[in-house]
Amino acid sequence: MESKPKEFKPTWNLQNGKMILPYVLLFAGIILTLSLGSFDAGERGVEYNFFGRLGYYISYGMFFMFGAASFLPGLFTIGLGSLRLVKEEFELTNRLFSIPVFLLCYTVTLQVTGHVSTIPFASQGGFVGQLLSSGLEFVFGSTGKILIHLVFYFYGLILLLNESPLHFIGRILGTAGAKYKEGFKSGFGKRGESLGSLFQSAVEKFQKKESVPPWISTNTNEKNSLNQSYSLSNPHTHSYERNLGNKQPSELQNTLHSTFGKEGKLSDFLSKVDTGPTVTSKNSRIRFQNHGAFSGNFEEQGKVFRFESVSSSLSEKIREEKNFQKTPSRWEILDFRTSSFSNIISEKEPSVTLVVPSESEIKKEWNQTNPILQSEEIPDKFLFEEKEKVEQTDSGLENECYEEESVDSEENLSEEETLSSETSTEKDISENFKTSTISNSKEVSPNHTSNSSIHSLEKSEEKLELGLPFPPTTLVPEVKSKRSIYHVPLKSLKTTTTKIQDPLFKIEADKVARKIEEIIRQYGYESQVVSMERGPIITRYELTPPLGVKLGRITSLSDELRLYLAVKNIRIVAPIPGKSTIGIEVPNSIREDVFLGDILHQNLSLRPKKDLSILIGKDISGKLVGIDLNKLPHLLVAGTTGSGKSVCLNSMISSLVVHLSPEEVRFIMIDPKMVELTLYEDIPHLLMPVITDPKKATRALAWAIQEMEARYHSVSKLKCRDFKTYNEKVEQGAHRDGYKKMPYIVIFIDELADLMMVSGKDLEDAITRITQKSRAVGIHLIMATQRPSVDVITGLIKANCPARMAFHVAQKTDSKIILDQNGAESLLGKGDFLYKSPTAADLIRIQSPYVSEEEIEKIVEEARKFGKPSYVDFNLDEETESSVVDEGDEELFEQAWEIVRTDRKASASYLQRRMRIGYNKAARLMELMEERGYVSPQIGSKGREILK
């Protein structure tokens, strides 16, 4: 009885490790490169990174250690892994050692060139680059540092070419002339001696030695007996092993025997090696220097020699490993009584039925709104999934059965189980739904539905909305996004690289401080500069006022100080809030640029989540200043032309676009000048196109009032006091009751004075209503004007906008209107402004960040990739006469028209006296008559003409 061969489980060996090495290199290189490429230093960097926390922290460490050179290892490993896959003989050992050499050299190169990265801590060569560069420069100097790291570049190149330095230099020198070129390629030495002559001299030296090296043991008798016993015991021995004993002497061996004879020790050794001698395991790893004497050949690169004969122990290992790699036999149980061979081979096209729910069942179950696809006849190939589930539950079959590669062996379920599953599913479907069958010849897509199903689904959605205890929570449409994550990279924003050196600043500041003390002393007041604070554009010098002298006397010296210091403007703060000193703000001789990119990069880790915080610039000490629209809640900006007012508005919009997605904030932009805010057209944050018509601006604000009322209704139903609490409750579970999360709405008005001239009272009423009530429902207003007069910034608007920004203005009266005090007239312009906070009594002097038009276009381009804007369903072009007079006032309008028609007097004051109503109501009625064409427009002091 034949015994079954014993099965061996495959074991791990070095050959498998070499085969998987290129895949490991490719995988590691791709992960490292993509992680570095998607790295974002912001607070949401883990979310934006392609490989989550692993990629984020690896990238963070690499950038910190090696700077911009961190991309080098990933690209190198991808290249080496690809070459190894294409060419199996490609050696990786020495080439992998070249990666750290190139990495360290590149960090020094970046440190020398002064490379600046968009990531703050990844500039130049990182920590390692700074350390190496400083050490090399300290030891060898700046020139020696450059030469030394170039030498290491050369060494890394040699390692990459997998050659020794001497061989590489010799090969390069050999190609210089035709005389040496052929000699190096064919193996000639310096004197033109061939390999055979060199070998002959080596053999002669070897024959002079009478003893064989002790690490070689050759016992031919034992070897022959072992080979014979092994071949008899194992009939499946490879033919290569069985023929080793009968192998004919090689050509090289015959030549050597004829030259040196067969009696010498060298000839005996060669014959034993050529026929496969047995080498002891103790010395089996020795590499012989005279490998050219053995039969074999060099590889293509000429560095590795392959022997033709193999030892018996090594050949046995190779044979056993090949047996291990055989796949074991797989078992499959087929029941030919219940399954036919034709059904297994032939695949029938399935017939698909579309199940449509009835209207009566939709009323009972709101959750079932999608049609269900069910097949009437389930072929065998659709039962594979059920078969796998049965096999997983049955532990006995799991240990014994294996899947076959062909389709014939993939049926394990019996016909009774198949029929029972089909009948059970058909019963469930027939009890709940009415089916409609589609023929097999028609292809049905998963998204295909009939007209009746669409109509029923629309009815179900309408009834679901009607079933809510309140009207829709918001009129804002949802954004149809193309991406799952909204992200605008900061690489497109410009950053400054030059900083004013501290020694130069100290010299300049000390000089100005001595001048200030001398000027004040000339007017009879002794004072001393005790401290100074340097900002981007100004430096504040703090003086101790003399005792018994009024502060007004020192503040009156502003013109004299400006004259003797030869500066444009000087601002005196007397006293500094919270201190017993006087502050004199003097412009710097070298003005430091403040870019939006610098501010956003510095504040990435400090910015809180999901709020309307905006960075508005740097104060006089160089610290970042930010505002939160939730706490303001509205902002009023004023300044003359060229003061930086519109640039500040653009920087605030860009900051919101970079940090917040359209699901978190939406914009309404009103730009009568038609040149500032039109850059943001078609971004997904917009609720309506950028408005340039002043008449449409009033209608847009009227829509905002409707949205405000709708939001108040839903917020009050959820028992919330503010908008942030409402959204938090919706996220926690209130969305199950029909509540929806709502985005913030920010309304930007670039030129308020032009709108007030056209719309006047209507616009003021709309702004007043929004500023009074919209804070609690997430609607905020930012208005800018270049003419801060009383007729533009009225008392109601000022009362509801406690937060204000004042850029450079022409007169002190304008500064008092916007800030309620002087100071804005002495500003420097170009982004220099005073900020009045609703929570602080003193003013803060801030330098606004600069953002160019090209940077805005890049930000807008990145934002547009998220999706197209979803505008509100609101027609801005339609007439609003129906909204001016409601149903209750229609009778009042008819009465007023009757008075005008009979008395032939068309004036608001006459209607006010006759109807005993207020002037606003009477003027509104006259405007409505003008819109309907009953009376003519009023031209100057001339009365209106009655047209009907």
Swiss-Prot record:
Major site of localization recorded for this protein: membrane
Family annotation (Pfam families): FtsK_4TM (PF13491), FtsK_alpha (PF17854), FtsK_gamma (PF09397), FtsK_SpoIIIE (PF01580)
Locations listed in the record: Cell inner membrane
GO BP term, pick one: chromosome segregation
Residue ranges crossing the lipid bilayer per the database entry: 19-39, 61-81, 96-116, 138-158
Binding residue positions for ATP: G642, S643, G644, K645, S646, V647
GO CC field: plasma membrane
A GO term, aspect molecular function: DNA translocase activity
Membrane topology, Cytoplasmic segments: 159-948
Start-end of Acidic residues biased regions: 400-419
PROSITE patterns referenced in this protein's UniProt entry, alphabetically: FTSK (PS50901)
Region (Disordered): 389-458
Polar residues bias (residue ranges): 432-451
InterPro entries, per database record: AAA+_ATPase (IPR003593), FtsK/SpoIIIE/SftA (IPR050206), FtsK_4TM (IPR025199), FtsK_alpha (IPR041027), FtsK_dom (IPR002543), Ftsk_gamma (IPR018541), P-loop_NTPase (IPR027417), WH-like_DNA-bd_sf (IPR036388)
Entry keyword Cell inner membrane: yes
Mode of membrane association: Multi-pass membrane protein
Keywords assigned by UniProt, alphabetized: ATP-binding, Cell cycle, Cell division, Cell inner membrane, Cell membrane, Chromosome partition, DNA-binding, Membrane, Nucleotide-binding, Transmembrane, Transmembrane helix
Domain FtsK residues, every copy: 622-816
The protein's role, per its UniProt record: Essential cell division protein that coordinates cell division and chromosome segregation. The N-terminus is involved in assembly of the cell-division machinery. The C-terminus functions as a DNA motor that moves dsDNA in an ATP-dependent manner towards the dif recombination site, which is located within the replication terminus region. Required for activation of the Xer recombinase, allowing activation of chromosome unlinking by recombination.
Similarity annotation: Belongs to the FtsK/SpoIIIE/SftA family.
Domains as described in the record: Consists of an N-terminal domain, which is sufficient for the localization to the septal ring and is required for cell division, followed by a linker domain, and a C-terminal domain, which forms the translocation motor involved in chromosome segregation. The C-terminal domain can be further subdivided into alpha, beta and gamma subdomains. The alpha and beta subdomains form the DNA pump, and the gamma subdomain is a regulatory subdomain.
Protein name: DNA translocase FtsK
Species whose genome carries this gene: Leptospira interrogans serogroup Icterohaemorrhagiae serovar Lai (strain 56601)
Upper classification of the organism: Bacteria, Pseudomonadati, Spirochaetota, Spirochaetia, Leptospirales
